[in-house]
A protein has these predicted regions:
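Helix-to-loop junctions at the C-terminal end of transmembrane segments
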Residues: 117-129, 214
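Extracytoplasmic gate region of multi-pass secondary transporters
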Residues: 67-108, 114
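Juxtamembrane intracellular "pre-TM" segments in multi-pass secondary transporters
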Residues: 45-71
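Helix-loop-helix hairpin linking two adjacent transmembrane segments in secondary transporters
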Residues: 1-43
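A late C-terminal transmembrane helix in Major Facilitator Superfamily
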Residues: 180-219
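A membrane-interface helix-boundary motif in multi-pass transporters
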Residues: 18-32, 212-233
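C-terminal membrane-cytosol helix-exit motif in multi-pass small-molecule transporters
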Residues: 32-51, 239-243
Length: 250
């Protein structure tokens, strides 16, 4: 699923690039593809019926596991940081290479790398289990640090950009494939919805977070906020590591 999502992004980015040659507003026509997809979904996807839905139950309201809210926060931060990297990359690259530099070619590679990383998720997750999550976060920390120190160094900037595409392709599938371990069957759908809402919140607040990180560094350097983001994910890595190991020792 994750790989197909990245493939769809690649195709639609390409179509938007073709349409923008007609008119910049024409590029927004790519969103129209949602209508036939919605129609296909409505006509072909069957309703999911719980076999036990007809069995009378004591309707006791279940409490959501606090771990779910931690995952929502993680989703917010992960998407926020990913969007910040994509948005700020063009400005940093232009500062290094000059105003005539076209950053879109490198950004177009991101979904392709996401596809490759997505296909690798299954074997890696089978091999190292929860280490997949740790490794994804470590790659994100390295990505942020490389971008943070890439002032004038295009190699560091590109390496950081490409590494950032791995994290989402590994962390989100890991979270969703293990969500049933922290929720019940009655709350898993709501928990999934909350995580997706967290992704949208992260997308929305990315520019605000970038400005706040820039303010905290007291620097006008375009790469400065990524030191803050790297620090945040270092904390997340330690919290995740100790929380999962504490749970396993019980």
């Amino acid at each position: 699923r994750n790989s197909m999502e990245a493939l769809g992004q690649t195709i639609l980015i390409f179509l938007a690039g073709v349409l923008v040659n007609i008119n910049w507003t024409a590029s927004f026509l790519v969103y129209a593809i949602a209508f036939p997809v919605a129609l296909l979904f409505a006509l072909k996807v069957p309703e999911i019926r719980d076999e036990n839905s007809d069995i009378p139950e004591n309707h006791v309201k279940e409490k959501m596991n606090p771990m779910v809210f931690a995952l929502v926060l993680f989703a917010i931060l992960l998407v926020m940081n990913s969007i910040a990297i994509s948005v700020r990359f063009a400005s940093i690259a232009t500062e290094i290479k000059g105003v005539n530099f076209n950053a879109s070619n490198y950004l177009a590679l991101m979904p392709i790398l996401g596809i490759l990383a997505g296909f690798m998720f299954g074997p890696i997750n089978k091999w190292i289990g929860k280490g997949t999550l740790y490794l994804g976060i470590i790659f994100f920390i390295i990505s942020n640090l490389l971008i943070a120190v890439s002032n004038g160094n295009m190699t560091f900037l590109l390496t950081g950009l490409f590494l950032s595409s791995i994290t989402g392709s590994w962390c989100f599938p890991f979270i969703f494939s293990n969500l049933d371990k922290v929720t019940t069957k009655n709350t898993i759908n709501f928990a999934t919805s909350l995580i997706f809402i967290g992704c949208n919140i992260g997308n929305f607040i990315a520019p605000i977070a970038m400005q706040l990180a820039q303010f905290l560094t007291r620097s006008t350097n375009l790469t400065a906020p990524f030191f803050v983001f790297a620090g945040i994910f270092i904390v997340i890595l330690f919290v995740t590591f100790f929380a999962t190991n504490k749970k396993n020792t019980r």
